[in-house]
Structure formats: C-alpha cells, structure tokens
C-alpha cells in the first residue's frame, strides 16, 4: 500500500473541545468505577480495518477525582500532597502527568495523523476510555486534568460546534474493541529485549495492539496479552515507550 493510500482517510482535525457543554447529566464518580453506561456504545467496537492499524492501550492510568461534590478535581502529586498523605498512599500513585505525556506523544505522531492509530485508556479504577484520533490534547497539565475530570463526571466530551464525541467512557472488557486475531503485546523491562522493527515485521499482521503502563515506574499486570517484550536495554518513561512504538510502526508501514 502506498503512502498516499495510507493518508487518504486522514481528515483535518477539530482542535477545539467543548468543555462547557451542559447536555450531559453529571454523574457521581462512585457510580463510574467499573460501571460505564450500558447504553453507551463505542464507535470502534469490533473494528474491521482493511488497512494497517495500531491500537495503543494505556493501562493503569492515574485518574482519580477528589470527593469535593462542588468542584471535583483530578488528584495529582503536586497540588494534593496533603490529601494523598491523609489517604495513606504514595505520591507515585497520582501522576496524571505520565498519561498526559503519553497522549501528547501519540497524538502528535505521523502515525496518528495518517489515520493509523487508535488509543484507549484504562484507569487503575477500571474505567475504560476511548479517544478519537481527531482529539487535540491540551498542552498544559492543568487544562488536561480539567478535561479528564469533566470526562469522568459526564462520560463524554463533544467537539465544539459539533455533535461529534471526542472522548467517551465505554464498557469493559478492552478486548471487544480489538479486531479478532490481533496480536496484543505488552511491554516490560523484565522481558527479553527485541529490535522492535524486526519484531513488527515478523508479526505479519495489519492490526497490532500494544499495552503500555501509564505509570511512573513498574509493570502492569494484565491477562489479555498474547506476548510480552522489552523494547530497550535501558529504563524508559511511558511517554518515550509510546514514541518508540509509533516510530517503529511508521518505519515498517512507510509513514513519513
């Protein structure tokens, strides 16, 4: 397939997200944990893609709201240190900046701009989120946390002046949104190190899914992967792992 064919479905991105829409009824965060709206269907469920598609699943993301009913916020280790201490938890458990870094790298990649990337997030509270490739990720962590806080309360975020949904909470499990037979690869420092481009070529699959832990350190425990690999001899941040994966697929799939 030529480079032009890869890009023919890549439409101009809508860069404005409607953060002020009052169309959706606010939902208590306690109702959200692991219990997405049963009537809310994902547009990408059982995608049958005739071309190449990379699925990135960002696991164990640190997205948790404060209990303030009037103004709930995403808890982060910079602004809520006293709260985290009262919760008797580690500051490392509240790092939404790690997820933010991952998303910035993924959505600015040529692979995403070519329409060949689909991203999902699953939080440590087991909330599953689908993000449209057209979404413009906020540049600052403050705006990003505000956006994700609204999403966790309202289940979805729409584009400004459009009915198009850019971010939405969907039902578990994640595997129902990945094409049948698609390899699902997780990354771990403890696994055998591979040269990623060679590994991708040997998969011989148009659809591939990678699981990346959206955490500051350590591995994530999942039971749905088909293989686990290490992509570097050195410890890497989650954001750099996402960048390296996208770059490898861009080389293999001839995306410039």
Where are these regions (language model features)?
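Beta-strand-rich binding-surface signature
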Residues: 53-55, 209, 225-228
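RNA substrate-binding interface of SAM-dependent RNA methyltransferases
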Residues: 2-193, 250-255
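Long, charge-patterned amphipathic alpha-helical coiled-coil/hairpin "stalk" segments used as oligomerization
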Residues: 144, 170-173, 187-197, 202-218
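Short, well-ordered alpha-helix to beta-strand connector turns
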Residues: 180-182, 206, 225-226
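RNase H-like, Mg2+-dependent phosphodiesterase core
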Residues: 3, 198-203, 240-241
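Structured adenosyl-cofactor binding patch, chiefly the S-adenosyl-L-methionine
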Residues: 216-256
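Short coil/turn segments at secondary-structure boundaries
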Residues: 68-71, 197-200, 222-225
């Amino acid at each position: 397939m030529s480079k032009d064919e890869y890009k023919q479905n890549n439409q101009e991105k809508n860069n404005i997200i409607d953060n002020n829409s009052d169309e959706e009824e606010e939902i208590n965060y306690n109702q959200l944990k692991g219990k997405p709206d049963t009537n809310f269907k994902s547009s990408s469920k059982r995608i049958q893609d005739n071309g190449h598609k990379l699925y990135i699943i960002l696991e164990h993301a640190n997205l948790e709201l404060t209990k303030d009913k009037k103004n709930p916020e995403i808890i982060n280790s910079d602004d809520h240190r006293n709260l985290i201490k009262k919760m008797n938890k580690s500051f490392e458990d509240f790092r939404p900046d790690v997820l933010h870094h991952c998303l910035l790298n993924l959505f600015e990649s040529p692979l995403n701009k070519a329409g060949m990337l689909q991203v999902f997030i699953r939080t440590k509270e087991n909330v599953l989120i689908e993000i449209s490739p057209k979404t413009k990720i906020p540049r600052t962590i403050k705006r990003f946390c505000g956006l994700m806080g609204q999403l966790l309360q309202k289940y979805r975020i729409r584009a400004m002046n459009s009915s198009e949904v850019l971010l939405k909470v969907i039902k578990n499990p994640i595997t129902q949104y990945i094409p049948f037979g698609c390899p699902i690869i997780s990354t771990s420092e403890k696994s055998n190190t591979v040269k990623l481009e060679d590994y991708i070529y040997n998969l011989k699959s148009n659809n591939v899914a990678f699981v990346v832990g959206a955490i500051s350190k350590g591995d994530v425990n999942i039971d749905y992967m088909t293989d686990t690999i290490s992509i570097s001899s050195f410890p890497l941040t989650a954001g750099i792992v996402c960048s390296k994966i996208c770059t490898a697929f861009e080389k293999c799939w001839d995306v410039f």
